[in-house]
Amino acid sequence: MVFTNKIKDISSIGIADIIGAGTSALFWFFIASIAGPEGYGETTYFISIAVLSSNIALFGAVNTNIVYTAKNIQIQSTLYIITLCTGLISLFVVLLFFNNLGASFLILGLVIFGLSTSELLGKKLYQTYSKFVITQRILMITCGIGLYYIFGIQGVLLGYSISYLPYIYVIIKTLRTVKIDFSLFK
């Protein structure tokens, strides 16, 4: 029974990631075909800036969250506050230097994504993780394409950012239930 549950858990992660990767590939091929080389290049340039900035803001928080959550050490809220603050600083720095609202908000979306998924995986909520991944990809496609036709390339970045909104639920739920305790950082 335990073995079949583990296979089921691993399968749900694998299937969600495969579906997510496949839909993402189709989405980006579609965006490349309608935006043209210059528009697609600009999009990937700003996504690269957002990914780099979010990785700086997350600096080890994802792995820390997975390990401590799995050990049932209640560090999440403290980690979230620190990481979200660094994410907001990154957002404003990118907005100041590149004047791109889509890339700036994408930083915050990627930070929220990293923190939320690390908690879900640390708690071994694999099916919940799968639902969030598939929901995010559906939102990425609908918002990204929809906003492209309204705002152009900037709309793709905004749509991509908006697609991470469901993950806020995990953050808010944790902030309400887990006490902030800076003494855990020794």
Q: For each of these PLM feature ranges, what is it?
A:
Residues 3-59:
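Signature of the first transmembrane helix
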Residues 3-4, 35-39, 50-84, 121-127:
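Transmembrane-helix boundary and interhelical linker motifs in polytopic inner-membrane proteins
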Residues 5-13, 79, 129-132, 186:
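Hydrophobic alpha-helix/TM-entry signal in multi-pass membrane transporters
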Residues 8, 12, 16, 46, ...:
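Alpha-helical transmembrane segments of multi-pass membrane proteins
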Residues 14, 41-44, 80, 130, ...:
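Hydrophobic/aromatic positions within or immediately flanking transmembrane alpha-helices
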Residues 17, 29-33, 47, 63, ...:
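Transmembrane alpha-helix boundary and packing residues in multipass membrane permease domains
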Residues 20, 24, 28, 54-62, ...:
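Alpha-helical transmembrane segments and their lipid-water interface positions
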Residues 82-186:
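Hydrophobic transmembrane helix module of multi-pass membrane transport proteins
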